[in-house]
Amino acid sequence: MIAADTSTWVAFLEGVAGDDTEQLDRALEERQVVMVPAVLTELLSDPELPPEVSETLLQIPQIEIRPAFWQRAGMLRAQVLSKRLRARLGDALIAQTCIDARIVLLTRDRDFRAFVESAKLDLLLARP
């Protein structure tokens, strides 16, 4: 089971070739993909997103947010920032969701490496 970050989803939806988009395609065919709620929010924020794509994205099972999630996400972000590493709020929410659910995160965004070092995020960083 995997979750994909927004960067991988956008590349996939635009038909961009890459290790990550191929892995996402295979995982979708095998029904081995779950959706991070923050990623879904980012994807649905695109005013140009076709309605049929929105409907398809909404059919992917979402990872459940667990109690005290917001506190853990805030502490995770603070931990990364204390090391003077980049930790965008959305990335912290995505990382914490995957950490809590023990789900591998597939991405092409190298900023997630900071969460691997700080919190043992299970990351599959693909070459675009």
Please provide the spans of the model-predicted regions.
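Phosphate- and divalent-cation-binding pockets in alpha/beta enzyme and binding domains
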Residues: 12, 42-43, 72, 114-115
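A generic structural signal for well-ordered alpha-helical segments
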Residues: 26-28, 55-56, 80, 98, ...
